[in-house]
Amino acid sequence: MSILIVDDEKEIADLVDVILRNEGYETLKYYDSLAAQKEIEKNNSIDLAILDVMMPGIDGFALCSKIREQYTYPIIMLTARVGDVDKITGLTIGADDYVTKPFNPLELLARVRAQLRRYKNYSAAKPQERETFESKGLYINRQEHTVSLFDEPVILTPTEFEILWLLCENAGNVVSSEKIFETVWKEDYLDSNNTVMVHIRRIRDKLKEPPRNPKIIKTVWGVGYKVEK
């Protein structure tokens, strides 16, 4: 698997590179975000990107947006800032996960593995589960990993797809933010975590939902989200 690493801090980029190569991953390492952008434009064999947020010239957010114009592979952002602003911004424009500097190499590796596993296996449906869902013009095929709305294709990232499928799989029932987070990310949920909310907003945007009156993904305030049968 090929992983793109972009960080203008040479020590950080080199550390990430060593961590991943020691685990058998192929890496593409860039200290220059402009050179990385050119790589993104021409290389369609990247499986995951690790992007630093604060870089001169083209920052990590701009690179993330550039990737999302063409690809759905996972993106992990690196940030030196502890607050939620960077995290929410990154998730809103298409990032899948965040790691705060300084980081534990084992944590970074675990997040990389989790994202790659989700990316490579998202289309594998369990035999006991139904494989399609249809309601109000929305059609989802889990086996083919396709989504359409009134026959128009909707392009979702693997994480967005898993969230939408979880809601549709439980259509008619409210699914809590905690349940969504722990099912999709397989980590303990914190009450202050805005990750689910930001991903729901992105999915709604792609489904062209009216912000004040969404028709497909309903918010049940204080409880969670649901899709009607």
Regions found by a protein language model. Give the residues of each.
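Charged docking surfaces used in two-component/phosphorelay signaling
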Residues: 14-22
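Conserved acidic carboxylate
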Residues: 7
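Basic, amphipathic DNA-recognition helix from helix-turn-helix-like DNA-binding domains
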Residues: 65, 69, 74-134
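Active-site beta3 strand of CheY-like receiver
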Residues: 44-50, 55
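Short, Lys/Arg-enriched segments at the junction into DNA-binding effector domains
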Residues: 2, 114-161, 165-174, 178
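DNA-binding patch around the recognition helix
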Residues: 130, 155, 200, 204-229
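Acidic catalytic/metal-coordinating carboxylates
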Residues: 32, 59-62, 86
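Short hydrophobic/Thr-rich beta-strand motif most characteristic of the beta2 strand and flanking loop
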Residues: 24-32, 39
